[in-house]
Amino acid sequence: MGYTNYWHQHRDFTKIEWDQIKEEYDYIKEVCEGVIVDETKKADQIVFNGDSKKDHHHETFVIRKIVKTKKDYKEQDLSFNFCKTAMKPYDLAVWHMLCFINRVCSDFAISRDR
């Protein structure tokens, strides 16, 4: 089943914003234990997916403190991001994080296939 969350990040997050986002992610890791698997390796990123042992994984969700600056192709909109979750259980964690970030950063636009 196709189901995707979308967002536009037009700028880098400030230190204050990023600290709030990371704090919320710590909360999500706690309440979604067994649903999401944290794959974060760098302090300036949040990376997670669903639990592959339960076949609850799909595309990995990645949020970066610093926006991407190098295009992969000429017409690429560097602000545009998406994560296909196929409505698997970790979709709630993805959407929660996007809604939280949108609340913290009003210029962070979000939408989904719903």
Describe each region flagged by the PLM:
Residues 1-114:
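Acidic (Asp/Glu-rich) sequence patches and key acidic residues
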